[in-house]
Amino acid sequence: ASAEGGIYKFLSDNLFGLLKADPKCTVFIRAALNCANASIEKVKPAMERLSDIASDKFVVGEENFVESPAGHQLLKKIIIQDKIRHSEGGHTFSKMLLDQLNAKNSLESYIGCNRGAFLLVTIMETGVPSLQQLVKDCLKQYGKALGAQSTRGAELLVQKLNLHK
């Protein structure tokens, strides 16, 4: 357990650099953040750091974390695990991410790109009612922007929002 604290502190302190250094680092990051045996209090700072990085505004089509294959897969796999985290009473990455997206007014970046919209669909598919409601609440003001998108991710997101009214 003593190594656990050091590993997660290293991860929190160096997450951005690891993500930039090599996309393959996402495999380690995903394993660390989704580790069933890790203390949530040790994992939480790294999840908060990842949500901070993932919630930065970006221009669709330009190099960014959300649209990169490795970044998208990392976020998707961590969001999927939120169903388990929630059932165990832990902090969910999805809530951290949505809170950051709201605080930074960067939800439009997610809505405007296929992979970003798919990540919001993935949050809806966790089956966690509080997360589903949070997505709906966050997206209320973006109805027109979402409706104007022609990506498959945006289409599915509109369907999910209508299914969960």
Pin down the residues of each PLM region.
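Eukaryotic gene-expression regulator signature that favors modular helical reader/repeat domains
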Residues: 1-165
